[in-house]
């Protein structure tokens, strides 16, 4: 093991962000237990699988972010980890849609929307993988558009879910959209003076807020 590689593994690149993402990952793992236990009492395999996809997408995002903010091996590896971090956002959005489409809707509308959302996620991942200089605003535009695909089935969702559940779904979407706009516009303007707390970190704070809202929705109204 070279000295540079050893230093990159043993020295944390961004301690603050690495710690907060690690805590979020642990909380997501813990949160999986009551969610899946509740679903397991009265639900079938498809019901449990849909919720498992949601919780695994959340854990995967925070795990990828933890690794990205922890390791500092080389510019090439850092770029790869950053891309994976960004790709996992597509997985999280699609993973959040999965229980809504499979359980709340559960009909042709739900399966059509599920196919559309995962299709967009795959396209977004390929764009991030192949377009080396993909600008933040473009990725953010896809994130936000993907997050609001549910508008296409808004009437069906409202009729299939209690109003309180829909409000949690809506709150998560609004919080996520606000974070996406901040990320796309590279806000706040003090980025250059705050090395470890810029638009990327603020975006992830909003993502955690979105995760919390949607977890509450899943636990109370879907599981």
Locations of the language-model features?
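Multi-pass alpha-helical transmembrane bundles in non-GPCR membrane proteins
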Residues: 1-223
């Amino acid at each position: 093991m070279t000295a540079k590689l050893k230093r990159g593994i043993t020295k944390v690149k961004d301690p603050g962000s690495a710690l907060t993402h690690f805590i979020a990952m642990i909380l997501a793992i813990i949160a999986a237990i009551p969610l899946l236990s509740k679903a397991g009492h009265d639900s079938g395999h498809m019901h449990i699988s849909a919720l498992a996809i949601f919780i695994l997408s959340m854990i995967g995002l925070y795990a990828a972010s933890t690794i990205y903010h922890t390791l500092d091996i080389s510019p090439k590896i850092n770029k790869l980890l950053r891309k994976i971090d960004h790709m996992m956002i597509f997985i999280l959005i699609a993973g959040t849609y999965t229980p809504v489409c499979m359980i709340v809707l559960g009909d042709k509308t739900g399966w059509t929307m599920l196919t559309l959302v995962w299709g967009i996620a795959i396209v977004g991942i390929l764009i991030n993988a192949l377009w080396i200089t993909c600008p933040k605003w473009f990725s953010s535009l896809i994130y936000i558009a993907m997050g609001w695909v549910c508008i296409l089935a808004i009437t069906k969702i409202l009729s299939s879910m209690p109003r309180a559940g829909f409000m949690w779904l809506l709150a998560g979407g609004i919080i996520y959209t606000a974070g996406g706009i901040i990320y796309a516009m590279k806000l706040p303007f003090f980025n250059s003076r705050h090395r470890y707390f810029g638009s990327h970190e603020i975006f992830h704070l909003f993502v955690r807020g979105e995760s919390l809202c949607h977890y509450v929705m899943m636990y109370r109204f879907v599981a």
